[in-house]
Amino acid sequence: SGQTCSKCKKRNHAMCTSECFSGLKIHTIRANYPLWLKRITEVQQGKAVLSVRQWSGKPYRSPQIEITRLTVKHGVDIQKVVLYRTEWYDDDNKCHYCYDVTLDNDKGINIDDIARNDGLNPIDFIEWFDRDICKQKLDDDGRVHKELAIIHFTKFRY
């Protein structure tokens, strides 16, 4: 839900088949890390399952369809990441942006890899998350950032 299908270019892709996606989705990225940490901890303790869903039609205005249920046996886990956007003005008098992603331990992640593993191409990934990051205030380094949760569906980790 909310992703752009790389083949048909529809933002609301609930009608798209899985082969339309730009890649295999092995995780999802969500805001509110503390909430997701609590939920994923319950899954890891065997007290809950992770229900992976998508909208059947228009997001937030249609029923959700459950795709699968995941447990600790599937490798469900969480990692905190920070998406940064650096802004500057060049000689052309236009604002330019550079994006980077780091884990909470400051290990950098290739933005192409994280986008692909989230089922998106890099441009769609940046466009999707830029809507939230642009609402943040500039820090002293001229960057804006947003803390996010990567919810892993498999044993893969960055």
Segments from the language model and where they lie:
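Catalytic phosphate/metal-binding cores of nucleic-acid and nucleotide-processing enzymes, i.e., regions
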Residues: 1-158
